[in-house]
């Protein structure tokens, strides 16, 4: 079929398999160009490996460190009549390129919150890898099915205490609007912590540890975003922030356990990037369009892949073997460039003056839109979008 982009709200409802493959290859080439990480991980589990920072982590491990990787995700394959999700095509492309380079690559498609996913991963690790030396936790899901009761819990992207009103961009109509978000109830805050907090990360590590598949010295990392006062009401000081604070709690508990065998657990605080997850958060698209323009001008811009390559090479797996630099909460900070005072001051000054008319001139909004479509495989250089493509792409994946 010939596939064109169709957007609804903050998602694109179509995806392009060839475009997604080209995106993955671009990230692989970026990683290979950095050169190998001398003392990187060799057997890696990535939970949430099909897009964004999780996909970049899998690429960094495999193509930067020559690691065998096992990826866990929840994606839909394409059918004769309908394309699959971008994450399905990303994972298929990763698998193809990893195998072409002689690297071990297997994937599990199913609910990562379930007991079954954990057991499937353990069985594969025992059969194929023995033990793993790195676990990346990168789930971004709006809903979690509790593994014991089967109850569905939903997260909320809401402020706490009072209604949040701010200038934002309507990405469907390309208009500057004023948006208001009602505050979260106590229940909504609790539910957001249940879905997006650290509990499932702990459950994964407990299951892996009990099964004896964690090697001595195993490192685990989960991803967070803090931002600044520009986004704090909706993010760090909102319901989502409470969940990310719970990730800090989990990291501390996990670090205490893993350090007894020479391992570690850290939250890595990353910069804002264009992902399906960030596009759903009010004000983030406008903030990203502003901050990207300034960071590009300063030569500081990074996408997911550049961020994760820096985390591997300059934080977790330093050439000198030294422990990574952390903040006072033991977090790895990769948002250091974004948080530079001159970058943030620029955004603070610019925010009130952005209008629908000057949006594309004052910010990188057009680039934001391009990058958003690219997540789904569209607008990728060198791809013929008038060509007939097969939406059914299969690869080495266990489904349940």
Swiss-Prot record:
Q: Which InterPro entries match?
A: Eno_Rdtase_FAD-bd_dom (IPR024906), Enoyl-CoA_Rdtase_cat_dom (IPR024910), FabV-like_NADH_b (IPR050048), Trans-2-enoyl-CoA_reductase (IPR010758)
Swiss-Prot/TrEMBL catalytic activity: a 2,3-saturated acyl-[ACP] + NAD(+) = a (2E)-enoyl-[ACP] + NADH + H(+)
Q: Which residues pair up as cystines? A: none
The active site consists of 235
Annotated NAD(+) binding sites = 48-53, 74-75, 111-112, 139-140, 244, 273-275
* Biochemical pathway: Lipid metabolism; fatty acid biosynthesis
Q: Which GO terms describe its biological process?
A: fatty acid biosynthetic process
Q: What is its EC number?
A: 1.3.1.9
Feature type site, description Plays an important role in discriminating NADH against NADPH: 75
Q: Print the keywords alphabetically.
A: Fatty acid biosynthesis, Fatty acid metabolism, Lipid biosynthesis, Lipid metabolism, NAD, Oxidoreductase
Q: Quick check: keyword Glycosyltransferase in the entry?
A: no
The UniProt function text for this chain reads: Involved in the final reduction of the elongation cycle of fatty acid synthesis (FAS II). Catalyzes the reduction of a carbon-carbon double bond in an enoyl moiety that is covalently linked to an acyl carrier protein (ACP).
- Oligomer status and interactors: Monomer.
Family the entry assigns: Belongs to the TER reductase family.
Name listed for the protein in its UniProt record: Enoyl-[acyl-carrier-protein] reductase [NADH]
Q: Which organism is it from?
A: Shewanella woodyi (strain ATCC 51908 / MS32)
The organism that produces this protein has a lineage beginning with:
Bacteria, Pseudomonadati, Pseudomonadota, Gammaproteobacteria, Alteromonadales
């Amino acid at each position: 079929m010939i596939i064109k982009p169709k957007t609804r709200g903050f998602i694109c409802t179509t995806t392009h398999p060839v475009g997604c493959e080209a995106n993955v290859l671009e990230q692989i080439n970026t990683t290979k160009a950095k050169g190998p990480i001398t003392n990187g991980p060799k057997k890696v589990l990535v939970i949430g490996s099909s897009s964004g920072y999780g996909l970049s982590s899998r690429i960094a491990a495999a193509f930067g460190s020559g690691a065998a990787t096992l990826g866990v995700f929840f994606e839909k394959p394409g059918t004769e009549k309908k394309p699959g999700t971008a994450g399905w095509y990303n994972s298929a492309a990763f698998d193809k390129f990893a195998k072409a380079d002689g690297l071990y690559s297997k994937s599990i498609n199913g609910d990562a919150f379930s007991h079954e996913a954990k057991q499937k991963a353990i069985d594969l690790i025992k059969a194929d890898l023995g033990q793993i030396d790195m676990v990346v936790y990168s789930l971004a899901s709006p809903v979690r099915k509790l593994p014991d009761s089967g109850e569905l819990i939903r997260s909320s992207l809401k402020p706490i205490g009072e209604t949040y009103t701010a200038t934002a961009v309507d990405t469907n109509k390309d208009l500057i609007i004023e948006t208001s978000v009602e505050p979260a109830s106590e229940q909504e805050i609790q539910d957001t912590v249940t879905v997006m907090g650290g509990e499932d990360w702990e459950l994964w590590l407990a299951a892996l540890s009990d099964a004896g598949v964690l090697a001595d010295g195993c490192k685990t990392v989960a991803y967070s975003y803090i931002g600044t006062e520009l986004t704090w009401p909706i993010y760090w000081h909102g319901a989502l922030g409470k969940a990310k604070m719970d990730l800090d709690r989990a990291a501390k508990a996990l670090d205490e356990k893993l350090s007894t065998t020479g391992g570690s657990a850290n939250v890595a605080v990353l910069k804002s990037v264009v992902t399906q997850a960030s596009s759903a958060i009010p004000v983030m698209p406008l903030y990203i369009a502003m901050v990207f323009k300034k960071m590009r001008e300063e030569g500081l811009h990074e996408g997911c892949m550049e961020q994760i390559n820096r985390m591997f090479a300059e934080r977790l797996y330093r050439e000198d073997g030294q422990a990574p630099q952390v903040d006072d909460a033991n977090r790895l900070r990769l948002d250091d460039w974004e948080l530079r005072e001159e970058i943030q001051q620029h955004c603070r000054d610019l925010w009130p003056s952005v209008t629908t008319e000057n949006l594309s001139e004052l910010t990188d909004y057009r680039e934001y839109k391009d990058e958003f479509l690219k997540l789904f495989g569209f607008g990728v250089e060198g791809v013929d979008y008038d060509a007939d493509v097969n939406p059914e792409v299969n690869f080495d994946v266990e489904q349940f």
